[in-house]
């Protein structure tokens, strides 16, 4: 696919970065704000960043910089809600049904709401059946060792000195050969904010662009991983979406992974960055690259208007469960708009309560019903939303597993998830990975990758 104003060849094919010695495929000075492809610290054509804005991304709005969406009071800040344990698999191709052994958490209370109203077809005492139709067992218990809340594997370095780090990187790339270990040691132990400061310090000290220097010294997967780490988080999501729709074909699973898992504020920031950086409307690009009910679901996700209150209305959960049953299993055909409306607007704690009510009412879990009623990428998108309501770390753990399972490695997915979750919930993702697959994430990465690329991934993930 070709777009006006872009270089004739568009973005290069995967891994998505230009070979050493070639001009960057990111916007040039005459096209977009960033001549090197990455935003300078507070520079470029973006408007001045407000106090407290994203570092190195002048023009990205500060957290909370957007007005609260109409009709959904109580939206949280960009950190988003905590993970909600207890999910189902995603990595298999669309069409698979069942739970694939995802763990169930201990009981959680989300507060508020009247007692649940008995529903015809429910179970005595509100108990779930010991087995679902087809012999599927309920989720096993979540291990007591599971770290509560969310935690990244990368934390801001104490006694941080951007100029000292810039000097280390300069020495690592100076002369014959490259000291990749020095690069690994620096970038894997600095937060994204600190990396933006290093990038700015490098240009101030040496009058050179750090990203261009890194491109000239690195190649392949190592280059892609390093460049991803130096992109501001919002920009990386926007860039990944652009790449997923650039050229022939569309990488639908990338669209699902980003748009169906981010918080309202993150989505709004992505939409704004996409417009500023690429001069394009994200919603229009999605409409031109997708169709049908999948298109409608992604357009709904682009609005960033999900209710983010943590309280649960149990009466609403019962009513939504009935509506979903009547829109799917309880009728001939499927009312897709009903599924879209509920899954696109309800908070994740509310959806979790709805799934529990649905299981009691229908003697079938909602994920299985979605598999029976939908197919293709709209099925994957709807299931991703439900999986995040149940267990967000488990969703990403399975995505990582399938990126390395079998012949070959989907390095793009591996890099994207490790980088984007490294400061959010990679600790919990690692714990779920071990429980689900009886091996550690680092063990699987070590057996599926090699060289400095492996060293850097393992340094980010940890043991």
Curated annotation (Swiss-Prot):
Stretch list, region Repeat-rich region: 1-143
Residue stretches of each Annexin repeat: 160-231, 232-303, 315-387, 391-462
Pfam families found in the cross-reference section: Annexin
GO cellular component: collagen-containing extracellular matrix; cytosol; nuclear envelope; nucleus; plasma membrane; synapse; vesicle
Alphabetized UniProt keyword annotations: Acetylation, Annexin, Calcium, Calcium/phospholipid-binding, Repeat
Residue ranges, compositional bias (Gly residues): 86-99
Disordered: annotated segments: 1-34, 77-149
Positions of region (3 X 5 AA tandem repeats of G-Y-P-P-X): 5-20
Gene Ontology MF terms in the entry: calcium ion binding; calcium-dependent phospholipid binding; GTPase-dependent fusogenic activity
Superkingdom of origin: Eukaryota
PROSITE patterns: ANNEXIN_1, ANNEXIN_2
Record GO biological process: establishment of localization in cell; glial cell proliferation; hemostasis; insulin secretion; intracellular calcium ion homeostasis; intracellular water homeostasis; ligand-gated ion channel signaling pathway; phospholipase C-activating G protein-coupled acetylcholine receptor signaling pathway
Sites bearing N6-acetyllysine, chain numbering: 208
Biased composition (Pro residues): 1-18
InterPro entries found in the cross-reference section: Annexin, Annexin_repeat, Annexin_repeat_CS, Annexin_sf
Family: Belongs to the annexin family.
Domain notes: A pair of annexin repeats may form one binding site for calcium and phospholipid.
Role played: Calcium/phospholipid-binding protein which promotes membrane fusion and is involved in exocytosis.
Family annotation (PANTHER family): ANNEXIN (PTHR10502), ANNEXIN A7 (PTHR10502:SF239)
Subunit structure: Interacts with PDCD6.
Protein name, UniProt field: Annexin A7
Record organism: Mus musculus
Upper taxonomic lineage: Eukaryota, Metazoa, Chordata, Craniata, Vertebrata
